[in-house]
């Protein structure tokens, strides 16, 4: 949404059951976003020539940007693409001490059944009570307990959130997140550079012509 909330997401695939669906049901559909005071101004756009979404929050007390992207880049052997079922939310601190709460409310399997949330030192695991084969894992550089309890967070440096369909083998930290961001950014810049250019609506076409998220 325009305020940085994810209100519809089928996961891990495009035709999978939804895990966030507040666009259809505000009460129980599930969402993943940021809650700030009414003093904040929120603007949203895409990083030029990419499919990376930028949502900027600014007020007198501080400013930060949330960069949303799904990793996408050429594999090391150059025979295909690395396209994991993952969504990064890179929280880039700009100035001051901005405050917000994270609304992490997954509702797997179209919000049917009870949602089970398990918190571990590494992640928050979620799944549906009567269909637990599909699970989601939220990794973060912020306190997982604060996220689960929806406590106010004061941002003083860059942080990240990672929603993954799989448990991560490689430890995830902010430096790893920045590497994934840079790889994805370069991929999109190269992809758009090779694409046909149009006089009108060129940037809009980038966002509706995304390559399929399946390894080639």
Short names for language-model regions:
Residues 1-205:
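Terminal accessory carbohydrate-recognition/targeting modules of carbohydrate-active enzymes
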Residues 206-216:
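Single conserved hydrophobic/aromatic residue that forms the stacking wall/gate
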